[in-house]
């Protein structure tokens, strides 16, 4: 069989989301594997563009959270529509509700929004 005829199956939005949720339990280096230098993360405080800015956001976030924080995260809602993933989650008592929306392209997070509701 000609190697050019072998198709590479694209990584699904669901796969990227599940990897992202697992990576959050591991740490910043693992979570950064889901992004590219074209990625954008939008929060209520700022917009972070590219790997360096997104890494800075997650380094600060992970430094402020107690060890094992993401192990206790409860997923309330999880919706995938084509290249868009939405999650609603809680981690009481610290976080009553939070949402993330992800736009996934080529197996990476292109755009993410993140908001916490107290």
Give each language-model segment a name.
Residues 1-9, 18, 22-25, 42, ...:
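A beta-strand edge to alpha-helix "cap/lid" segment located at domain peripheries
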Residues 26-38:
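Short, well-ordered alpha-helical segments enriched in acidic and aromatic residues
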Residues 45-46:
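Short, solvent-exposed loop/turn segments at secondary-structure boundaries
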Residues 50:
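Short, conserved phosphate/pyrophosphate- and ester-handling motifs at nucleotide-, phospho-/glycolipid
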């Amino acid at each position: 069989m000609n190697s050019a005829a072998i198709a590479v199956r694209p990584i699904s939005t669901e796969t990227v989301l599940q990897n992202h949720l697992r990576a959050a339990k591991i740490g910043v280096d693992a979570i950064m594997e889901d992004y590219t230098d074209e990625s954008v993360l939008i929060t209520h405080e700022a917009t972070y563009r590219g790997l360096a800015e997104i890494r800075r956001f997650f380094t600060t976030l992970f430094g402020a959270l107690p060890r094992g924080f993401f192990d206790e995260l409860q997923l309330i809602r999880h919706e995938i529509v084509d290249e868009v993933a939405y999650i609603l989650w809680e981690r009481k008592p610290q976080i009553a509700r939070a949402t993330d929306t992800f736009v996934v392209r080529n197996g990476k997070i292109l755009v993410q929004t993140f908001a916490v509701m107290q």
